[in-house]
Amino acid sequence: MKQFVYLFAVIIVFTACSNSIEDNKKMAGDFLDLALSANPLEAQELTHPDFKFVFMGNTEISNIPYDRDAYFDYWLPQVVGKLLPTGITLTTTDMIADENGVAVIMEGDAEGINGEYDNKYVFVYKFKDGKIFSIHEYNSDLLVATRLYKNELVKISK
């Protein structure tokens, strides 16, 4: 009887973890579709009140934490909207997930303010209380610097 109870408990735990992983993957997949839509505030409902976003890298817009209000009121319209005025199409190529987070690997297709801007991304989502608690965005910051900000590469002579 003890073995039956133990097996039943393991099945319940496994099923609960499996459901939360699938729920997290769905939420992560839906988030950017909503955030980059005509009504990005719909995505705000998926975020935790203490939400934090950080664009990682070595550019002038990198490593600045944005809370929920700053992400939706400033980052999306004033940074993304101005650099990619015609929007961006993001295609998910893979997801890696567990019960605490999801890494979403994506390819982007966009016209930036200085021409074609097709980058590759990894968005790392962490969850708390069934909501998106944080997102860290990784991409080619070299491409951001050269295609969006017109920075030039300089050869360093030895």
Question: Where on the chain are the PLM-derived regions?
Answer:
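Short, low-complexity N-terminal intrinsically disordered segments enriched in polar/charged residues
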Residues: 4, 11-41, 45, 152-158
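Hydrophobic pocket/interface hotspot
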Residues: 28, 42-44, 51, 71, ...
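A solvent-exposed, acidic/Ser-Thr-rich amphipathic alpha-helical stretch
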Residues: 49-98
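Short, surface-exposed coil-to-beta transition loops
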Residues: 88-90, 116-123
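Beta-strand elements of well-folded, non-transmembrane domains
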Residues: 110-112, 129
